[in-house]
């Protein structure tokens, strides 16, 4: 049983945070497209970024900023425009976005982080952000997480948020988050953006370590289409407003509980991103055991979840376990094929490298009737374990992406 409980509230569950979202006119549809999350007090700040060499201007801006300072107060996010592959003008637009909101909030510009998502290669209409800044600051509230979550969406069908709370050092500590992502999802920190807030008092370096590990277990273990975005980014702020004794020791129970909370929020958001994958009809959870370490297991799991053949079989309700075995074998992790066991839900398909007789029609019915499909692979006697999440590949995915800018 977890030492924390799930609650509502998203990024405003944590004390001291306000959030909101408005329509600035960036999206031609008129939907909300500008979000703000902020705390009056500087917060310990952590960032995890895309590994794509073609990086959006906000990614480079935040990376450089957080290399120089450990705290930030605000995150500004626009949707409908990625501000990626936009050259010098894009860099200047990211800087001006921070400056505009710094003035509206009464902060210094180096306390404001920025993020963008949308179409790549189109100049960011900074004048719309300039005009909307004060209205967004005025609209931000202590219950505004849902409005912010809506304003960061692009091809997403649903907003994604969650929060947890627990007692740490005798104080109630909250961790909450919002995320967006539906296509171009194969993070190696899709477009995938995630924003985490906490009111925990924690050492900055420790906070960054916790966030990095939580990202590895969650957002770096999901895939929709194998494409890593130019804009993938997770930003996490910890305000200290819970007034718990500051967590300094990475080996302490308090640090362990905080990491559990951050990881739980990240995993929940990551699974919601995959479930909302473009054209997806089911979530695929791939569990791998028996490797030499957890990193190897995670690598195999993500390779299987990423396989277009596996994803197509899941969409077609085809229990083609050979595709699962083949994907595991090309993951680049050594294991003995004679030890491989494969299970689909409750159906044992392969044991000690040998195929098993199973009810193919019943297995197909399991796929047809499940919105979450569980795949289990045992590759050896090791203690390594790993999980990855993917979704099926449907006709609608091609349709959505064939017509994205037309």
From Swiss-Prot:
Locate the site labelled Involved in the stabilization of negative charge on the oxyanion by the formation of the oxyanion hole: 117-118
Tell me which residues bind substrate. 154, 180, 191, 278, 401, 406
Q: Does the keyword Amino-acid biosynthesis apply?
A: yes
| The protein's Enzyme Commission number | 2.3.1.35, 2.3.1.1
Spell out the residues of the site Cleavage: 190-191
Gene Ontology cellular component list: cytoplasm
Instruction: Name the Pfam families for this protein.
Output: ArgJ
Keyword field contains NADP = no
Q: Which residues form a coiled coil?
A: none
Alphabetically, the GO molecular function entries are: glutamate N-acetyltransferase activity; L-glutamate N-acetyltransferase activity
Q: Where is the active site?
A: 191
Q: Name the pathway it acts in.
A: Amino-acid biosynthesis; L-arginine biosynthesis; L-ornithine and N-acetyl-L-glutamate from L-glutamate and N(2)-acetyl-L-ornithine (cyclic): step 1/1; Amino-acid biosynthesis; L-arginine biosynthesis; N(2)-acetyl-L-ornithine from L-glutamate: step 1/4
Q: Which cell locations does it reside in?
A: Cytoplasm
Query: What biological processes does GO assign it?
Result: L-arginine biosynthetic process; ornithine biosynthetic process
Enzymatic reactions: N(2)-acetyl-L-ornithine + L-glutamate = N-acetyl-L-glutamate + L-ornithine; L-glutamate + acetyl-CoA = N-acetyl-L-glutamate + CoA + H(+)
What are the protein's UniProt keywords? Acyltransferase, Amino-acid biosynthesis, Arginine biosynthesis, Autocatalytic cleavage, Cytoplasm, Multifunctional enzyme, Transferase
Its primary localisation, in coarse terms, equals cytoplasm
Q: What class of enzyme is it?
A: transferase
What is this protein's function per UniProt?
A: Catalyzes two activities which are involved in the cyclic version of arginine biosynthesis: the synthesis of N-acetylglutamate from glutamate and acetyl-CoA as the acetyl donor, and of ornithine by transacetylation between N(2)-acetylornithine and glutamate.
The text of the family note is:
Belongs to the ArgJ family.
Q: How does it assemble?
A: Heterotetramer of two alpha and two beta chains.
**What is the name of this protein?**
Arginine biosynthesis bifunctional protein ArgJ
Organism the protein comes from: Gloeobacter violaceus (strain ATCC 29082 / PCC 7421)
Q: Which gene encodes it?
A: argJ
